[in-house]
Amino acid sequence: MALVEKIQLTDDFSVYANPAAKLEVEFIHKEIFIDKCYDVAPFPDDSFIVDAGGNIGMFTLYMKRKYPQSTILAFEPAPATFSTFQRNMELHNVSGVQAHQCGLGREDASLALTFYPQMPGNSTLYAEDKTNQMKSVDQNHPIAKLMQETHEVQVDVKRLSDFLGEVPNLKRVNLLKVDVEGAEMDVLRGLDDEHWDLIDNVVVELCDSKGDFATAKTLLESKGFAVAVERPDWAPPDLKMYMLIAKRN
């Protein structure tokens, strides 16, 4: 298991992470805490939020800081990353988070996850897609070098609706956040109509390497959402990276 140390990100905020992944940790912190990429709507204090692709817990920590009374259902399949997620919840004394060590998909399965110890947030069930994406990155760039170390780990994948169906008296899902490195459509197709009807907002980050952008946008619109599209300013011009921000009509 990768070494984990506490990384100080601001005067009053630190997280546990693999120190070799510090570049990625700082990037995610900026994206969520400074650029506020998930501040897509005002949410109720007691929001119910789904974190698909929990990584080391940065999104969940941000939402719990902003909405302390919220309930968050989080999913992270990589064992080392899930362990770090749990340590970060303990570090910040967070309650109201139900974390599951699994990925989300259209059906239950056991699949091979390609894990990047120095870039764990890029770990993927679709390694070929990730390899194709990296072709648009200069191979001398630090990110390309950090992505060179990989290994495979077998992980469980389950349907999101199977978890939502076990939540007592679930009235609304105020936000579904999906950042799952190529498995976005799998996550969305693991939702039954009864649960789609409960969702108010969806934010999906995806790289359109296999036509999923149009498919995801069409699916979200068919479920009653107005979909806005943003391109992250950090993405290279030939990397088809998008944020789909879907709000219920």
Curated annotation (Swiss-Prot):
One of its GO terms (molecular function) is methyltransferase activity. Pathway: Secondary metabolite biosynthesis. Its EC number is 2.1.1.-. The keyword Cell wall biogenesis/degradation does not apply. Disruption phenotype: Impairs the production of detectable pyridovericin-N-O-(4-O-methyl-beta-D-glucopyranoside) (PMGP). It is an enzyme of class 2 (transferase). Keywords: Methyltransferase, Transferase. It comes from the Eukaryota. InterPro entries: FkbM_mtfrase, SAM-dependent_MTase, SAM-dependent_MTases_sf. Belongs to the FkbM methyltransferase family. Methyltransferase; part of the pathway that mediates the biosynthesis of tenellin-type 2-pyridones, iron-chelating compounds involved in iron stress tolerance, competition with the natural competitor fungus Metarhizium robertsii and insect hosts infection. Methylates pyridovericin-N-O-(beta-D-glucopyranoside) produced by the UDP-glucosyltransferase GT1 to yield pyridovericin-N-O-(4-O-methyl-beta-D-glucopyranoside) (PMGP). The pathway begins with the assembly of the polyketide-amino acid backbone by the hybrid PKS-NRPS tenS with the help of the enoyl reductase tenC. This is Methyltransferase 1. It comes from Beauveria bassiana (strain ARSEF 2860).
